[in-house]
């Protein structure tokens, strides 16, 4: 049926307006989550802190998928996929694992790692 084929062809394309909207929304979301993570550090509540870190990374994943015009379906294996994208921060998976691994270390996660990661994604968006 040609109607199904036509719809399938349309769905395979990633619209520019969707890309711009996803990038704008989720960059804000990542920045907002980073701000809340910074506040949560001093509380010692690692559950609350880890929630904001997960939220920030999930938002960055959305941005990177959109930059590459790939539909984001879920978090499963997202960071592995990102490392293979044309537009991606270097060693993304390793950096994310380092951030989450630091939750269990004395002093908790380094906010600096999150700040640098966000800046790298912002540069990725503005550079290309």
Label the predicted regions.
Residues 68-97:
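Short, charged amphipathic alpha-helical segments flanked by flexible coils
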Residues 1-41:
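Conserved NTP/Mg2+-binding pocket subregion across the NTase superfamily
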